[in-house]
Amino acid sequence: MNQHRYLRAYMAGIVAPTLFLLVVLAVFCIARFGLKVPAPIEQVIVFPMAIMPNVFGLWNILYVKLQPHWHTPIGLHGALLPFILAPFGFFTASSLGLVKITNGGVLYFNALYVPYGLLVFVPLIGIALYYLVWKYIVGSLNALVGLK
């Protein structure tokens, strides 16, 4: 089963973020349209829904491509992805005016203020979550489609 190796890697990679973003979209739609919660998240949800699954798929293709030469665990490979996505996402959000840096913290959507002391934990939590998703979900899907 060595045919279409990279296509199988791409498809195994897009499953986790696609399912997660579908749940996020469903919760948002229920809150926004059913409960009439004023949440302006529709301005920013389209971009991640288009980009994130593709990034995960391409990152998994890179993992499969590098595996014969660079033997890293898939969890570690996935934990490296936030180091690329976080600066890109922060730059995009701040250039669109969705995130503002203040003297004492960061202001999201002109509604949610997070002090710098709490922001220390965000990268650690993000890296840990990516590690677990890649180790247990993407790794299992890679094994399921015969990639390892």
Predicted regions mapped to residue ranges:
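Loop-to-transmembrane helix junctions at the membrane interface
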Residues: 57-95
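Juxtamembrane/transmembrane-helix boundary motifs in multi-pass membrane proteins
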Residues: 4, 8, 39, 43, ...
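Alpha-helical transmembrane segments of polytopic integral membrane proteins
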Residues: 23-27, 55-59, 130, 134-138
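Pore-lining and gate-forming transmembrane alpha-helices of multi-pass membrane transport proteins
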Residues: 44-47, 77-82, 115-127
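Juxtamembrane "helix-exit" motif on the non-cytosolic side of transmembrane helices
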Residues: 26-37, 92-105
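Perimembrane helix-loop junctions in membrane proteins
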Residues: 32, 36, 64-68, 142-147
